[in-house]
Amino acid sequence: MTVIRGATTIAEDQPEEIKKAVGELLEQIEYRNQLKRDEILSIVFSSTSDIHSFYPAKAAREAGFASCSLFSAQEPEIDGGLALCIRVMIF
């Protein structure tokens, strides 16, 4: 099994920003790693605590990643941590 990680940031916590960023991130990961969607078992997202307007996993589902399990979680608040960040791990 191959596991691929990635991350992106958004300019502001708005549903459209999250949808756009997640869609672009997953498209780039697919392209750069020559992934096929039917090979993906699961996608796990984490986001910083300043993102609360939309689930990244729901954005992935709406972007066409509906045949694998999807999960979103919130990262712990870390002093000096990157703001408005969405991270992903693809199995």
Question: PLM features: residue spans?
Answer:
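Terminal domain-initiation and capping elements
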Residues: M1-F91
